[in-house]
Amino acid sequence: MPVIDESTMTYAEACRYFPGGVNSPIRACLPVRIVPPIVSSACRDIFIDSFGNNFIDFCGSWGSLIHGHSHPKILDAICNAASHGTSYGLTSENEISLASTLFSCLDLEDYKLRFVSSGTEATMTAVRLACGVTKCSIIVKFLGCYHGHADVLLKGISVDENNLQNVAHIVDTYFAGQPCLPLTLILPYNDVMIFEEVMHQIGERVACVIFEPICINMGVILPKHGFIESILAMCRRYSALSIMDEVVTGFRMGIRGMRSIMDVTADITVYGKILGGGMPVAALLAHQNIMDHLLPLGTVFQAGTLSGNPVAMAAGKASIELCCEPNFYSKLENLTEGFLSPIEEIIRSKGFPVSLVRSGSMFSFFFRDTPPANLSEVQQCDQERFGLFYRQAFSLGVYLSPASTEASFISSVHSRENLAYTQNVLIDSLVKSFDNV
């Protein structure tokens, strides 16, 4: 059992140097009220904190580590690349090699991509590119979907049934006072009626609609039938660009991502996380007619000293090649199914008001009777009981993503022994969470 109290000392030291003791806010674990572990090392499906406590990891660097920690092939690629230089400030062979591997896997012709260092950079660039291509400046996104911390994708004007009929007036008023600034409209996820009404009113002025094909940052939320199809159809009708954010889902459920799972293709697709194999890599990809609007061929600006870093590119290629191995995704699916099915059965048999939602190797526990369809329903979950459940599991060495609004992940290297142990821990934690409230 982890010695949780000792970690307070190390976390207090981290707080001397970093705001909240972290360099990304969710790592502070505030939603579940635990002292965040400080990691010393990690291998396969285990990380070890600074006091030697072992944790079975179901966060996996927020979905990046589909191959687990310290995979030998990825480590070898990193070490070999670093021995030739860590950064060039020029196009490298490793960039071309990873791009070639990607296009072969994705089976795309007449497409181009641009590598960047983070999902935020990729989505920010995708939106800027869409505005440059369409000469429009309205961005549509959906409440609860996270696309990085660029202002244009964090803030905006919310649209719901209360102000739906006044969208055109809201837009006109905004641009009258701030004619040069983009406007972001935030709509409810999974609401086709509201989305289509907004597009009917102002669709010709919309630069892009950005969406997650499966929501991850309010927990795993599946799209309702017809929702994604409506987004793509309305974008085509009004000549807006669709941007599919696959920073998390890309290469998680299949080598071709949601293009093959849902049979949908957006104008621009954004990748990250698994693409880097644990290193900082992201990319945006689109037909060359769109991508060639970027400098130096076009007028849309994007730049980055570490974009296409040769060491990160080598790690990314190794990660993608591992994903391409025979039966990789079917094995991962079977591993996840075998792990979660007994937990689902206990939830049903005991009548717990808990929805265990999964898609591929991603899963979330929602403490409510039915799976939520949007952020409003997520916020109705029993957060207090989720916290009890989480802290009990954590005390026994199981590390889920530390918020009810975050997904957890299975990797290809989770051992059956650790999964069996975690099954028992999660079932016991569920039972105790309902005994203690």
Curated annotation (Swiss-Prot):
Annotated pathway: Porphyrin-containing compound metabolism; protoporphyrin-IX biosynthesis; 5-aminolevulinate from L-glutamyl-tRNA(Glu): step 2/2
GO CC terms of this entry: cytoplasm
Superkingdom: Bacteria
GO molecular function terms listed in the Swiss-Prot or TrEMBL record: glutamate-1-semialdehyde 2,1-aminomutase activity; pyridoxal phosphate binding; transaminase activity
Coiled-coil regions listed in the entry: none
Predominant location category: cytoplasm
Keyword terms of this UniProt record: Cytoplasm, Isomerase, Porphyrin biosynthesis, Pyridoxal phosphate
EC nos: 5.4.3.8
GO BP annotation list: protoporphyrinogen IX biosynthetic process
The keyword Isomerase appears for this protein: yes
Subcellular location: Cytoplasm
Modified residues (N6-(pyridoxal phosphate)lysine): K273
Broad enzyme group: isomerase
Co-factor(s): pyridoxal 5'-phosphate
Keyword Cytoplasm on entry: yes
Substrates-to-products reaction catalysed: (S)-4-amino-5-oxopentanoate = 5-aminolevulinate
One Pfam assignment: Aminotran_3
Family annotation (PANTHER family): GLUTAMATE-1-SEMIALDEHYDE 2,1-AMINOMUTASE, GLUTAMATE-1-SEMIALDEHYDE 2,1-AMINOMUTASE 1, CHLOROPLASTIC-RELATED
Entry's family note: Belongs to the class-III pyridoxal-phosphate-dependent aminotransferase family. HemL subfamily.
Subunit structure: Homodimer.
Protein name (database record): Glutamate-1-semialdehyde 2,1-aminomutase
Organism of provenance: Chlamydia felis (strain Fe/C-56) (Chlamydophila felis)
